[in-house]
């Protein structure tokens, strides 16, 4: 592990293999020892765990995961990292590197085939330019017990946000509907090569067995949520009327009042249970 956290050794490693960082891929490699240790510990990784890692970089987190997990499958887009990873992960029989785009993977099939017989989970230092689509895909796959990942701190705060805060939005509610998110710890810029211009944070998303509340039509619920936050400075009546397009302003107004809310309320102050109530009321219109 020392060679993966020594900056001079890392630079020599990358130079030896002719590697050059790609700005378009958002490459910021993890190069400190304590972060992989805390991620592995926080995720509860043990010999029963089958871990999907996304963007292994030079293998700093991969190496630590392999010491605890039953198996680690790491998906890397940049094929120029192949000789680097071959060197840094040499001899780790429980690690498999797949080269390809994580957003083009059939995640359910990958988990079923590569992590069979193990508890599937995700641990990763996510490329910041694809954080939201990757998390969306992982959550929708609905086959991972937990997702423990490093993201920009502002994204972590948005995911964990409460109703009425500036960070609260449609993505917060999507993640919180499917998982129980927890912001674990911050990671400073000097833990990466090259150093990003933002603070990072590690979050854990624990898959829910059941949604936080009952709703008649989940698709309609998220149409309502997207409409409410698509024009978040408008009143909920106006935002839903414009955003849904299938209900009159008076129908929307009646539903909101029937749920016990004031006519001029905004969606940004509503909890998920309250969005469920409005969604269910709209079904009868």
How would you label these PLM feature ranges?
Residues 249-252:
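Short amphipathic alpha-helix in the helical subdomain of ABC transporter nucleotide-binding domains
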Residues 1-227, 254-257, 268, 277, ...:
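Catalytic cores of RNA-modifying enzymes
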Residues 241-246:
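Short helix-coil junctions and helix-kink-helix linkers
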């Amino acid at each position: 592990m020392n060679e993966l956290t020594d900056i001079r050794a890392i630079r020599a490693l990358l130079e030896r293999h002719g590697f050059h960082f790609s700005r378009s891929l958002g490459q910021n490699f993890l190069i400190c020892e304590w972060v992989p240790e805390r991620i592995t510990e926080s995720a509860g990784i043990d010999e029963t765990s089958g871990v999907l890692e996304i963007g292994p970089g030079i293998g700093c987190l991969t190496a630590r995961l392999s010491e605890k997990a039953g198996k680690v499958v790491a998906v890397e887009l940049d094929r120029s990292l192949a000789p680097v990873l071959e060197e840094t992960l040499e001899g780790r029989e429980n690690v498999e590197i797949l080269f390809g785009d994580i957003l083009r993977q059939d995640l359910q099939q990958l988990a079923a085939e590569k992590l069979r017989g193990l508890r599937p989970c995700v641990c990763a230092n996510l490329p910041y330019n694809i954080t939201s689509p990757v998390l969306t895909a992982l959550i929708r796959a609905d086959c991972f017990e937990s997702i423990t990942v490093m993201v920009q701190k502002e994204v972590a705060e948005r995911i964990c946000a409460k109703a009425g805060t500036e960070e609260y939005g449609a993505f917060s509610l999507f993640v919180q509907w499917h998982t129980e998110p927890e912001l674990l710890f911050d990671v400073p810029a000097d833990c990466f090569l090259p150093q990003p211009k933002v603070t990072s944070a590690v979050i854990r998303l624990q898959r829910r067995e059941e949604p936080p509340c009952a709703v008649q039509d989940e698709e309609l619920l998220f149409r309502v949520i997207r409409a409410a936050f698509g024009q978040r400075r408008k009143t909920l009546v106006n935002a839903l009327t414009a955003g849904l397009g299938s209900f009159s302003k008076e129908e929307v107004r009646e539903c909101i009042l029937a749920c016990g809310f004031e006519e001029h309320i905004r969606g940004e102050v509503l909890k998920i249970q309250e969005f469920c109530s409005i969604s269910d009321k709209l079904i009868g219109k």
